[in-house]
């Protein structure tokens, strides 16, 4: 393996947000492992090197693995001295008062307070984590952060140009086959003139140039399309700000053959200027399959 492995170790106080952090790194394209005993790290690296396919890893290591926690600093330092691994430690913290509030809200027990008071467990954990906190490259106090705000902070620091952290799926479909259940935005274009009733277009679909030109040259189509693209371009930054990693835009006509296909394809091409876009024509082949079965 010639690529450098980017390793982020997520650790910190219990209840400070490690689960949210791990989910954020997953959305940034990291291979994530939760609660790995540090003693297994050397074997894990051997497997990673042999695979040659993983370049970004996030590990959650905390006092749930208390029996294995000793020596973690030395193990990470050993990895950091190689050309193969670049290591960063992200330590999540919160005030005692906020941690108590979160534990009371979730009604969970602290891993170090099973036979005692909650505050005793928190104080003991702080003591045990002092060394790794001091060694951390990044300490985030989450006391005043919502899960979304913590996610945004992680994205700002760790997002790189190759992160596939947001993409758009444009889908055409036919209402006669049902709404796509995974769509975030659904547009109904059945108000547009239907090429199905034009004899020379009936056997074609919206990817064929004659049909595409027919659909897009309609005055109602052009007006609708300009308004649609203006709307979508204005709201996409909001989806990004809220931390969404994907948006599915579904455009439907009666059978999913002509109007929706032509519009979905054009929309995908235009949005691809600014965002990663995939396009799917869900029902375009269904009429052909139906004819072949008859």
Swiss-Prot record:
<dbReference type="InterPro" id="IPR053930">
    <property type="entry name" value="RapZ-like_N"/>
</dbReference>
<keyword id="KW-0547">Nucleotide-binding</keyword>
<feature type="binding site">
    <location>
        <begin position="62"/>
        <end position="65"/>
    </location>
    <ligand>
        <name>GTP</name>
    </ligand>
</feature>
<protein>
    <recommendedName>
        <fullName>Nucleotide-binding protein LCA_0526</fullName>
    </recommendedName>
</protein>
<comment type="function">
    <text>Displays ATPase and GTPase activities.</text>
</comment>
<dbReference type="Pfam" id="PF22740">
    <property type="entry name" value="PapZ_C"/>
</dbReference>
<keyword id="KW-0067">ATP-binding</keyword>
<dbReference type="GO" id="GO:0005524">
    <property type="term" value="F:ATP binding"/>
</dbReference>
<feature type="binding site">
    <location>
        <begin position="12"/>
        <end position="19"/>
    </location>
    <ligand>
        <name>ATP</name>
    </ligand>
</feature>
<dbReference type="InterPro" id="IPR027417">
    <property type="entry name" value="P-loop_NTPase"/>
</dbReference>
<comment type="similarity">
    <text>Belongs to the RapZ-like family.</text>
</comment>
<dbReference type="InterPro" id="IPR005337">
    <property type="entry name" value="RapZ-like"/>
</dbReference>
<dbReference type="InterPro" id="IPR053931">
    <property type="entry name" value="RapZ_C"/>
</dbReference>
<dbReference type="GO" id="GO:0005525">
    <property type="term" value="F:GTP binding"/>
</dbReference>
<keyword id="KW-0342">GTP-binding</keyword>
<dbReference type="Pfam" id="PF03668">
    <property type="entry name" value="RapZ-like_N"/>
</dbReference>
């Amino acid at each position: 393996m010639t690529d450098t492995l980017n390793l982020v170790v997520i650790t910190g106080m219990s209840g400070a947000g490690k689960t949210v952090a791990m989910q954020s790194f997953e959305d940034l394209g990291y291979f994530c492992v939760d609660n790995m005993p540090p003693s297994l790290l050397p074997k894990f690296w051997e497997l990673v090197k042999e695979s040659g396919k993983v370049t970004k890893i996030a590990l959650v290591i905390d006092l749930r693995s208390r029996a294995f926690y000793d020596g973690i600093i030395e193990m990470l330092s050993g990895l950091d001295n190689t050309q193969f691994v670049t290591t960063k430690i992200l330590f999540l913290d919160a005030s005692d008062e906020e941690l108590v509030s979160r534990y009371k809200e979730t009604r969970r027990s602290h891993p170090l307070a099973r036979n005692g008071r909650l505050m005793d467990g928190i104080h003991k954990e702080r003591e045990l984590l002092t060394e790794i906190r001091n060694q951390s490259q990044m300490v985030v106090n989450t006391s005043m952060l919502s899960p979304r705000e913590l996610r945004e902070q992680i994205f700002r620091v760790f997002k790189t140009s190759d992160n596939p952290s947001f993409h758009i799926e444009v889908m055409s479909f036919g209402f006669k086959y049902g709404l796509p259940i995974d769509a975030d935005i659904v547009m109904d274009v059945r108000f547009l003139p239907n090429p199905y009733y034009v004899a020379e277009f009936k056997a074609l679909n919206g990817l064929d140039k004659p049909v595409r030109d027919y659909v897009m040259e309609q005055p109602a189509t052009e007006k609708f399309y300009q308004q649609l693209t203006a709307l979508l371009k204005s709201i996409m930054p909001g989806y990004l700000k809220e931390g969404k990693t994907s948006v599915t835009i579904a455009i439907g006509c009666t059978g999913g053959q002509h109007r929706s296909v032509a519009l979905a394809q054009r929309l995908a091409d235009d949005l691809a200027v600014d965002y990663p876009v995939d396009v799917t024509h869900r029902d375009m082949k269904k009429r052909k399959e139906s004819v072949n079965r008859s």
